[in-house]
């Protein structure tokens, strides 16, 4: 997600 840089 947008708030998860590790997954994006």
Curated annotation (Swiss-Prot):
Signal peptide: none annotated. The modification Phenylalanine amide is found at residue 8. GO terms for cellular component: extracellular region. Its main location: secreted. Keywords: Amidation, Neuropeptide, Secreted. It is found in: Secreted. It comes from the Eukaryota. GO terms for biological process: neuropeptide signaling pathway. Modulates the action of morphine. This is Morphine-modulating neuropeptide B. It comes from Bos taurus (Bovine).
């Amino acid at each position: 997600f947008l708030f998860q840089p590790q997954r994006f």
